From Swiss-Prot:
Comment field (misc): Toxic segment of the protein is located in the N-terminus.
Any single biological process term in GO: symbiont-mediated killing of host cell
SUPFAM superfamilies according to UniProt: delta-Endotoxin (insectocide), N-terminal domain, Galactose-binding domain-like
Top-level taxon: Bacteria
UniProt-recorded Gene Ontology molecular function terms: signaling receptor binding; toxin activity
Protein name listed in UniProt: Pesticidal crystal protein Cry13Aa
Keywords, comma-separated and alphabetical: Sporulation, Toxin, Virulence
Role according to the record: Endotoxin with nematicidal activity.
Length: 803
């Protein structure tokens, strides 16, 4: 029987369409351009977001097609897309020179997940339920599906109303207004308070005791939607409150208090929803033993919950506008694992995982527990396999063989493991980046073999003639007991790459025990071991704030510092005990003024010596400072922004301003923490927030002057004429254009900035101050097939902005 692939995430994603597969359907060969495709979709989302700030119209046609494809049996990484979208929150106004517009974040979420005019609420639940069945072998009841669908419909109606009143208040004729009216401000205020109350009542349905792990992704999306409603209202209030009201008047004081309450409630809800998500996650966490199947079950659950919820939960604190007013990129260094592959695919057994990183001198290594595995700060270049092969004539050829060793080549070091020493050169090359690894094993009368492959290479040196007679089960693969055959069924994880391959041994192996077993750890595809700040947004050229996990550093020589799981942060934390020091290396690509912050948890006030030093000796920060004890944000009391935080497993996480403003030149620098206190402190990430953004792009105009000296190309079947093209490093934003000397019954079709417009006698062959959906670099023109245009002139001007 053909083995059906298990689905790893609860929401489908774009997985290796058309990639060659093994007899189980597992992908082999190159993974293709799945990451490039996703990045292109994110680019489209960004362009739509920028256009929305410009004209108040949010277009997500490409994303709706992706959703329709998922419903029809295809796949689309919606949760990855939302994470990318949330990272654009701070780009508000960045696309409009000199304008800061409080456009609602909720427009993005509603547009991505539930496009208007469709029944995608119910479809989304159906898709999730289908995937849940394949991952966890459990199913939502029809009654609950109907209830959740009703809740999501109500959610959508509410947030859509809030979205509409904000857009109506801030845009007129698709252009940002210069002043919001008092009546429109009150409409926004009223819509916000109606939305918040009903969303709160509906959230409880998503985390019932019976179905909590099945509805976890929907809970995360619902909470994200409510937090985005907070964000949209607060951003609107921050922008317009003091422009609409006299804050010393009774009316102004009332509206000011309403905004302050919204901020307080948002912080409380971020803490509450995070706590609920963590409790749900840990409450359903499978027990972890040393058995292979138990480890696989644990990893099936954790990777599903991380990819489908916890990665988004980690971004919730960044939605609070007063803490994160500019675009920020949070690096995620958490690791997740695919199913263990190799040694014996049809047998369970007690497993010992080998810590391949504990030395570079030997092929033998000590053991490591699954939850002790953390991010290794280097980039995998390739993996190599060493093969054992015995020609077992006259019975068969190449059926007594297996990989016995693995070699991992990183930028800085090479690590190896094997039943015997594999050396430094392998028989099989597996170039990075890799996204999936699988294995097949068979032990029978004249066969004892194993093959291992990834999406970039394979070890098809062994002749194994078995096949599966079962379907794949989560954490089990497939097998055929009568022939001693088994095969893993790992599948690429959305937006993830293999970061390391940990060898393991197991008991109860069929045949020779020297066959290779591997456990793959995965990290986000765009994660680099280099710590860089000062990166610029490619479109706006603004410097992007950066949140870099502290675990990307190193302990002082001779010290052993603990790295500990913290599921809600998107990264592990560094437990810095009294007297210990921790270092991190950075490169700043853009010098300027920065705010430096640290996110941490501590039960006591902790004195920390903080040293930021450049190569060459300059010391912008060289201070002993106290990191205050952090407390959980209370449900009802007033909120102290400095010390109250988000509760995790190891403490309550809060932001500490290390330096409100400091000049950080471009170049290489290092940060060192030393705990001079009497208790441990848990360090999550360092944040570098730029304070001096580049000047807004300058406006100018460029002329349009296109004489028609030959027939203008027809609209159908001919490439259009380019009648204007940018000059210099600019993009067009607006145009005024007209045609003279053309036939009165003719039509000129313009293509500009994603829009199509017609010049004909109905508009006097003229457009005045037209702003297309997107900025543009050229204008194209063609004519109707019915009337040729062979003479005349097209003139006008384009308003452009320097990049």
């Amino acid at each position: 029987m053909t083995c059906q692939l298990q689905a790893q995430p609860l929401i489908p994603y774009n997985v290796l369409a058309g990639v060659p597969t093994s007899n189980t359907g597992s992908p082999i060969g190159n993974a293709g351009n799945q990451f490039d495709q996703f990045e292109q979709t994110v680019k489209e989302l960004k362009e739509a977001w920028e256009a929305f700030q410009k004209n108040g119209s949010f277009s997500l046609a490409a994303l709706e097609k992706g959703f329709d494809a998922a419903i029809g049996g295809g796949s689309f990484d919606y949760l990855g897309l939302v994470q990318a979208g949330l990272g654009l929150v701070g780009t508000l106004g960045a696309a409009i020179p000199g304008v800061s517009v409080a456009v609602p974040l909720i427009s993005m979420l509603v547009g991505v997940f539930w496009p208007k005019g469709t029944n995608n609420q119910e479809n989304l639940i159906t898709v999730i339920d289908k995937e849940v069945q394949r991952i966890l072998d459990e199913k939502l009841s029809d009654q609950l599906i109907k209830k959740l669908n009703a809740d999501l419909n109500a959610f959508t109606d509410l947030v859509t109303r809030l979205e509409e009143v904000i857009i109506d208040a801030t845009f007129e004729n698709h252009k940002p207004v210069l002043q919001v009216s008092k009546s429109n401000y009150m409409k926004v205020d009223s819509a916000y308070f109606s939305t918040g109350g009903i969303l709160t009542l509906g959230m409880s349905d998503f985390l019932t005791d019976t179905y909590s792990k099945l509805t976890f992704p929907l809970y995360v999306l619902g909470a994200t939607m409510k937090l985005s409603a907070y964000h949209s209202y607060i951003q609107f209030g921050n922008t317009w409150l003091n422009k609409v009201y006299d804050l010393s008047s009774d009316e102004g004081k009332t509206m000011s208090q309403a905004l302050a309450r919204a901020k307080q409630h948002m912080r409380q809800d971020i803490a509450f929803y995070t706590s609920q998500a963590l409790n749900m996650f840990t409450g359903n966490l499978p027990s972890l033993s040393s058995n292979k199947y138990a480890i696989n079950d644990y990893n099936v659950y954790t990777r599903a919950m991380v990819l489908n919820g916890l990665d988004i939960v980690a971004t919730w604190p960044t939605l609070y506008p007063d803490d994160y007013s500019s675009q920020i990129k949070l690096e995620k260094t958490r690791v997740i694992f695919s199913d263990m592959v190799g040694q014996s695919e049809s047998r369970d057994g007690s497993v010992t995982i080998k810590n391949i990183f504990d030395n570079t001198d030997s092929h033998q290594h000590g053991s490591i527990g699954l939850n002790s595995i953390s991010y290794f700060p280097d980039e995998l270049q390739k993996a190599q396999l060493r093969m054992y092969d015995y020609n077992h004539k006259p019975y068969c050829t190449d059926c007594f063989c297996w990989p016995y060793g693995v070699i991992l080549n990183y930028n800085k070091n090479t690590f190896r493991y094997g039943d015997n020493d594999p050396g430094l050169s392998g028989d099989v090359q597996l170039p990075a980046p890799m996204s999936v690894v699988n294995a097949q094993t068979q032990t029978a009368q004249y066969t004892d073999g194993e093959n291992i492959w990834t999406d970039t290479g394979r070890s098809w040196l062994c002749t194994l003639r078995g096949y599966c007679t079962t379907n794949c089960f989560p954490g089990r693969g497939c097998y055929n007991n009568s022939t001693g055959y088994g095969e893993s069924c790992n599948q690429s994880l959305p937006g993830q790459k293999i970061h390391a391959l940990y060898p393991f041994t197991q008991t109860n192996v069929l045949g020779q025990s020297g066959k290779l077993g591997l456990l793959a750890s995965h990290i986000p595809y765009d994660l680099s071991p280099n710590n860089t700040i000062g990166d610029k947004d490619t479109d706006s050229t603004n410097i992007v704030a950066k949140g870099i996990p502290v675990e990307k550093g190193y302990a002082s020589s001779g010290q052993k510092v603990e790295i500990i799981r913290e599921w809600i942060n998107g990264a592990n934390v560094v437990q810095l005990s009294p007297g210990q020091s921790w270092g991190m290396d950075f490169t700043n690509s853009t010098g300027g003024q920065y705010m430096v912050r640290c996110r941490y948890a501590s039960t006591n006030d902790t004195p920390i010596f903080f040293n930021l030093v450049y190569d060459g000796g300059s010391n912008p920060i060289y201070n002993q400072m106290t990191f205050p004890a952090t407390k959980e944000t209370p449900a009802h009391d007033s909120v102290d922004n400095k010390i109250l935080g988000i509760k995790g497993i190891n403490g309550n996480y809060s932001l500490m301003n290390v330096k409100d403003s400091v000049e950080l030149p471009s170049g290489k620098f290092h940060v060192f923490f030393t705990n001079n206190g009497s208790s441990a402190i848990y360090l999550d990430r360092l944040e570098f927030v730029p304070l001096d953004q580049p000047a807004a792009p300058t406006q100018s105009t460029q002329p349009i002057n296109y004489p028609i000296t030959s027939r203008l190309p027809h609209r159908s079947g001919e490439p259009p004429a380019i009648i204007w093209e940018k000059s210099g490093n600019v993009r067009g934003n607006q145009l005024t254009i007209s045609a003279q000397g053309v036939p009165e019954n003719s039509q000129i079709y313009l293509s500009v900035g994603g829009d199509r417009q017609i010049l004909d006698r109905s508009n006097g062959f003229k457009l005045v101050n037209y702003s297309p959906t997107y900025s543009f670099t050229n204008i194209q023109a063609s004519s109707s097939n019915l009337v040729d245009i062979t003479s005349g002139t097209i003139t006008g001007q384009v308003q452009v902005s320097n990049l």
